[in-house]
Curated annotation (Swiss-Prot):
GO terms for biological process: negative regulation of canonical NF-kappaB signal transduction; negative regulation of MAPK cascade; negative regulation of neuroinflammatory response; positive regulation of canonical Wnt signaling pathway; positive regulation of neural precursor cell proliferation; regulation of DNA-templated transcription. One of its GO terms (molecular function) is chromatin DNA binding. SUPFAM superfamilies: P-loop containing nucleoside triphosphate hydrolases. InterPro entries: P-loop_NTPase, SBNO_Helicase_C_dom, SNO, SNO_AAA. Residues 679-693 have a biased composition (Acidic residues). Residues 21-47, 652-725 are annotated as: Disordered. Keywords: Acetylation, Coiled coil, Inflammatory response, Nucleus, Phosphoprotein, Wnt signaling pathway. Belongs to the SBNO family. Residues 719-746 form a coiled coil. This is Protein strawberry notch homolog 1. It is found in: Nucleus.
Length: 1269
């Protein structure tokens, strides 16, 4: 019988990477190591230690062997830890009984002399003597050491082959110990675990979508899919009857699935939340499904029920035309759309605003915070809208693309933005309004949901009191948790999310090789930036700049750094894009090129400098660095300095006031900042700019007199003349160096593309910029405005779009900023029906963003699906981004060209790296580079030179490692484990260095993920059972009522048994059909416990020699094996030879785990714990239904029984009778406490029933409607 406390220790130990079993019995191997004669210090290794954070120690259970606790002396390290050291008794007598362990604060039974010596030496901190000291003889080889850092509480694993002194001085961190490389050794008993690594597969992630409960309307013109987890829950019954005209439905102006969304939204709007607000609805449809029409349908439905006023918020004013088109298309011609920004301040219904009494007011999020300077009663847009709606307003408010209304409610120290507060205030002031949120990434990013307070997920009457409670619960639980929230919302009828299937779409990855000259130029640029960084630092120190100024300066510096290298990356691809585009046009297709940013600001600056004259295309990259040096280099002008020194204090200094520079930053950041931000490079840039601007605004809002960046400690205003001179000189030198480099820097990508592809008359440009640089017939270069005689700038993009859709121009270039919501597909209604080829030069590194981008050319009602071309260079990580995006496209149904990605699918593409494993891997990488930690993997073998040394220099150059001035000690940047920052910054390293570093990061990530899998801590998102050949049966189901504010209200606990083995009969059936020369039965070369492994092998990819493997106990394996690996471990045999071994393992795996089968005993079983590794038949307990309503209860049980770290694993099942179940796996030891909790909360069940009855009294139409339906 296991004592209650032992669970805790086992959890803690396995968390630390120590196999709990090692504490209990002695493996033959281990015992052999504990020889009585002490070998020399060099060979002997320290005892295995697990360091617990202090507060865990009082919960330590009683253990059979001696436990020694040594308190760490505060002098040596700042971590409060206690080290638990494992000693294995090598005496002949048996173990002491488990009930009475010896726990003592002493050193183990080593010779007394040693003990004294060690104590004294520790007291005197005598390091040399300590190093000579031999460890006690009876200490076994370590398993691993783990140390919990107080700073972040996460347990990190360190390899245990550090010098012996480490343990004797209690894990003191010493710089001088060079980390020795640890080559992972495969122990023989690891092997059978491997086959169990992913016993649950990920099946296809999307399923074909059809409305289930609603049978009206025509089919959607294109195939639509939904994630499988959502498709396995059914929405509530429909009792609402829409008022939309038969004509609209019969003509298919609203398709069946758009009508479904309209109906559920209207039905949800009939219910109220516990706090009295009307419930809202979230449309999570992806790009191209027709969100616009669905919204128009909801507005129309309410208009017909005489709710004639509606508000529609979106990201750009251009989309107003789309809104009008959508309303017109569904037959709601009489509903007018008014732009909020065209109204004068004052009553909207007044005469001077055209007496607007009804219709839709269309506004952008930014216009919501508009304010008039002149005063008056309705001087803000918000007041205008509130007055127009009236207090009892029960019409529709639509928040379209609501994820774009950034930082509506940032969590943490930053304040919510004005826009965010306005959106919340609008909802709070109009509690009866019918709110609709629309966002394709609606429920994938929980933080984006902050302002969706009408969904009733948090607040009064829900498990989460505040939004922050909800966020904490969800983010702690990883990917799976968000899926549960989404499923729960669909169950309750408040969420719907479909995506256009990518069937028919093809994509290819074009690798652009970098020429020698380009790499040379790139490396030169890197060197210049490294020098610039040093000069900025030196100059700031010279003139003794203030902290605030430095912060602003570095914000600008890194923002420019990132943009500079982004531009260089993109420029390397221009030639290839031009070639490809010309080819595609020849083949009768048309081309769409996606860019993230336009570089307009640089062009304007160059123009200003040249007095309106240009003699060549402007180099955006050069402009970035030049403007940085000119505006933000800390070298004050002489004249300005004098004015600062008191001659005229009122003139603020251009170069020295961060307020100015922040304003400037805003100005130039207008285009470049925002576009680099949109590109998915969640960089340190945009955030810093924002925060620097805020902070500098706050600090300089006082009197200008008391703000001076050059004040020294004595508050005197004197800056040494000499220092200023030197700073000026540095600035001049930098600009000279830049001029030298500028000869090689590439020109503005957008202008070059347009020029190469035949000029503005052939290329439709849809971007946010106002002018462009063109080359004239005589070869001269000039700047011209984009606007044309008959077309105002506002609708220029729409005109250009029309020209493209009419076939006047066959090439379109779109920038991120201008493109949201624009449709460029080969529409059946458009003249230009050529197949679209969509090329992207810059992939965002989140797949969601990429899909959003591709939604421009892949939409409903198209004649042909587009082709995507990703252009990637060999710079750090671009291939990786491409494969992540490709992976997502494949799961949505797209096809690759040819078979070239078959190799990559075995590659790393399945790991998205912006997650906790990525951050963990990055932490290990960074720490190993500065010798704070030992590397998990060896550096890339083909790197010429000293990898760690070179990379260290490189990272110092890009500011991710800082050097302390006086001591020369290396420290890591505060955000050193921020993936986005890392990926952006390493672009500023020389080409071969960044590639090697990225490779090293990727290898480390693979190792981290493998470790997590081994320790059973890997969060795989949603897993599938019954997707392969397993047989899934329901053996029991318990139902529980749960309180809920609407019709939902129960959870079920299923007991599921899964049989996954393969009998000999089944195996021989497959074997009979095999044809390949290497197919057939194999036996393992290694014999363990007098047994061999039998497997059945089938070749699935002859070109790559990839084989599928079947095992007797676990059936078909997900992981394909390469032939070379197979040959190392197995030899081919005839079926008769395999028979005995196959049957033996098949029969024993019914109730014997792999360990017991191969070793004769299982450590876990000997403790009385259940071990299921390698079993043929497994039992799972799955909780489904409205899990969100009992979330806190489930959390409570899981935490109390299994410790806080148990992960929430979601599973998808398909039972033998075809039923689909999605839910949470409840660990076996949590089942009975959970059942008790759910069933004893009888009151809440009664309450739930009462709430339901009460609800039905309040909504009689639901009952009458039900009888009508």
């Amino acid at each position: 019988m296991v004592e209650p406390g032992q669970d805790l220790l086992l959890a803690a130990l396995s968390e630390s990477g120590i196999s709990p079993n090692d504490l209990f019995d002695v493996d033959g191997g281990d015992a052999g190591l504990a020889t009585p004669t002490p070998p020399s210090v060099q060979q002997q290794q320290p005892p295995s230690t697990t360091t617990f954070v202090l507060n865990q120690i009082n919960q330590l259970p009683t253990l059979g062997s001696t436990i020694v606790m040594t308190k760490t002396p505060p002098a040596t390290t700042n971590r409060q830890t206690i080290t638990l050291t494992k000693f294995i008794q090598t005496t002949a007598n048996t173990r002491p009984s488990v009930s009475a362990p010896a726990v003592r604060n002493a050193i183990p039974p080593a010779p007394a002399k040693d003990q004294v010596q060690l104590k004294d030496l520790l007291k005197n901190n005598s390091l040399n003597e300590l190093m000579k000291l031999k460890p006690p003889a009876n200490i076994a080889q370590p398993v691993a050491t783990a140390a919990a850092d107080v700073s972040n509480g996460a347990v990190k694993k360190e390899s245990s082959n550090k010098e012996v002194a480490r343990v004797w001085i209690n894990d003191m961190k010493m710089r001088s110990f060079s980390p020795t490389m640890k080559v992972p050794v495969v122990r023989e008993e690891d092997e059978p675990e491997e086959e169990d690594e992913e016993e649950m597969g990920h099946a296809e992630t999307y399923a074909e979508y059809m409305p289930i409960k609603l049978k009206i309307g025509l089919r959607h013109p294109d195939a639509v899919v939904e994630t499988s987890s959502l498709s396995s829950v059914t929405p509530p019954d429909v009792w609402y009857k829409t008022s939309i005209s038969e004509e609209t439905i019969d003509n298919g102006w609203l398709s069946a699935l758009q009508l479904e969304a309209v109906t559920y939204a209207a039905q949800q709007h009939e219910t109220f939340l516990p706090n009295g607000d009307r419930a809202g609805f979230l449309i999570g449809d992806g790009a191209g499904v027709g969100k616009g029409r669905t919204i128009a349908g909801i507005i129309y439905e309410n208009y017909l029920l005489s709710r004639k006023r509606a508000l529609w918020f979106s990201v750009s004013n251009d989309l107003k035309y789309d809104a009008e088109r959508d309303l017109r298309d569904i037959g709601a011609k009489n509903i007018l759309v008014h732009s909020l920004n065209k109204f004068k301040y004052g009553k909207i219904s007044s005469k001077h605003n055209g007496s607007v009494k009804k219709g839709v007011i269309f506004a952008t999020y930014s216009s919501l915070i508009g304010e008039s300077q002149s005063g008056g009663k309705y001087k803000t847009r918000l007041k205008q809208l509130l007055h127009w709606c009236g207090d009892d307003f029960d019409g529709v408010i639509v928040f379209d693309e609501c994820h774009k209304a950034k930082n509506l409610c940032p969590v943490g120290s930053s304040k919510p933005t004005k826009t965010g507060l306005a959106v919340l205030e609008l909802q709070n002031k109009l509690p009866k309004a019918r709110v609709v949120y629309a966002s394709a990434t609606g429920a994938s990013e929980p933080r984006n949901m902050a302002y969706m307070n009408r969904l009733g997920i948090w607040g009064e009457g829900t498990p989460f009191r505040e939004f922050s409670d909800f966020i904490q619960a969800v983010e702690r639980r990883g990917v799976g948790a968000m899926e549960i929230v989404a499923m729960d919302m669909k169950l309750r009828g408040m969420y719907i999310a479909r995506q256009l299937s990518f069937t028919g779409v093809t994509f290819k990855i074009e690798e652009v090789l970098l020429s020698q000259s380009y790499v040379k130029m790139y490396n030169k640029a890197v060197k210049l930036w490294v020098i610039a960084r040093e000069r900025f630092q030196q100059a700031a120190d010279l003139i003794d700049a203030e902290q605030r100024m430095k912060k602003s300066m570095w914000g600008q510096f890194w923002s420019a750094h990132q943009r500079f290298f982004k531009y260089l990356c993109i420029a390397s691809k221009v030639k290839r894009v031009v070639q490809l585009a010309r080819e595609e046009i020849k083949n009768g297709k048309c081309v769409v090129i996606g860019l993230q940013s336009t570089g307009e600001a640089r062009t304007l600056e160059a123009l200003e400098e040249g007095g309106g004259e240009l003699n060549d295309f402007v180099s955006t990259a050069k402009g970035v660095l030049q403007s940085l040096i000119e505006k933000h280099f800390p070298a004050p002008d002489r004249k300005k300095l004098y004015s600062l020194l008191g001659i005229d204090l009122t003139a603020p200094s251009n170069n020295s006031s961060p307020r100015d520079s922040a304003k400037k930053a805003r100005k130039i950041g207008g285009l470049t900042g925002s576009s680099s931000d949109d590109s998915g490079s969640e960089s340190d840039v945009s955030d810093n700019e924002e925060s620097d601007y805020e902070s500098s605004k706050n600090m300089s809002s006082g009197d200008d007199d008391d703000f001076n960046p050059f004040r020294d400690d004595n508050s005197s205003l004197i800056t040494s003349q000499d220092a200023v001179e030197r700073a000026q000189q540095m600035k001049k030198d930098l600009l000279d160096k830049l001029e030298k480099l500028a000869e090689d820097l590439p020109p503005n990508t957008l202008d070059e593309l347009i020029d190469e592809l035949g000029g503005p008359e052939n290329v439709a440009e849809m971007t946010g910029r106002k002018g462009r640089v063109v080359s004239n017939d005589d070869g001269s270069i000039s700047y011209e405005s984009r606007s044309e005689l008959d077309v105002p700038v506002e609708i220029l993009n729409i005109t250009e779009k029309q020209r493209f859709m009419d076939g006047d121009k066959n090439i379109a270039i779109i920038s991120e900023a201008a493109s949201s919501g624009i449709s460029l597909q080969a529409d059946r209604r458009a003249k230009n029906q050529r197949r679209r080829v969509h090329m992207t030069l810059e992939l965002p590194w989140s797949a969601d963003r990429a899909i959003q981008q591709f939604g421009r050319t892949h939409r409903s009602n198209q004649v042909t699906a587009p082709e995507y071309v990703f252009l990637i260079s060999e710079l750090a990580g671009e291939q990786r981004f491409a494969s992540i995006v490709a992976k997502r496209l494949e799961s949505l149904g797209a096809l690759t060209h040819g078979d070239r990605r078959a190799t990559e699918s075995r590659d790393l593409s399945r790991f998205n790296f912006d997650n906790k494993y990525g951050r963990n891997a990055l932490e290990i990488v960074m720490k190993s580079i500065v010798n704070l930690d030992s590397p998990m993997v060896s550096p890339p073998p083909d790197y010429p030179g000293e990898f760690f040394k070179d990379v260290r220099q490189g990272l110092i150059g890009v500011g991710l490692i800082n050097v302390e001035d006086r001591s020369g000690i290396l420290t890591l940047d505060k955000d050193y484990n921020n993936i986005g920052k890392f990926l952006n910054r390493i672009l500023g390293m020389e080409v071969h260095q960044q590639n090697a570093l990225f490779q090293y990061f990727a290898d480390t990530l693979t190792a981290v993920v493998q470790n997590a899998k081994k320790n059973g801590r890997y969060d795989m998102g949603i897993l599938d059972l019954g997707s392969g050949d397993e047989k899934v049966r329901k053996s029991d189901v318990k139902k529980f009522l749960t309180p809920g504010y609407s019709t939902s209200g129960h959870v079920e606990l299923y007991t599921i048994s899964v049989e996954r083995g393969m009998s000999w009969d089944e195996a021989t059936k497959i074997w009979a059909e095999l044809t390949g020369p290497d197919d057939g039965f194999y036996l393992s070369l290694q014999i363990r416990n007098n047994k061999k492994t039998a497997i059945l092998v089938k070749e699935v990819n002859p070109k790559k020699k990839l084989f599928l493997i079947y095992r007797p106990n676990t059936g078909k394996q997900l992981k394909l094996e390469i032939y070379a690996d197979l040959k190392k471990k197995y030899k081919k045999v005839v079926s008769d030879d395999a028979l005995v071994h196959w049957l033996d393992q098949y029969n024993s795996s019914a109730d014997t785990c792999t360990h017991a089968y191969w070793r004769g005993n299982c450590k876990k079983a000997s403790l009385g714990l259940v071990c299921e590794i390698g079993l043929r038949c497994r039992t799972y307990y799955v909780l489904c239904g409205s899990v969100l309503s009992v979330w806190t209860k489930v959390e409570g049980v899981l935490a109390s029984v299994s410790g806080t770290n148990v992960k929430m694993q979601i599973v998808r099942l398909r039972t033998e009778d075809g039923q689909r179940i999605v839910g949470l796996i409840i660990p076996a030891n949590c089942v009975s406490p959970l059942v008790n909790l759910l069933s004893t909360s009888d009151q809440s069940q009664q309450l739930a029933v009462q709430q339901k009855q009460l609800w039905q009294q309040h909504h009689p139409q639901s009952i009458t409607n039900l009888s009508n339906v």
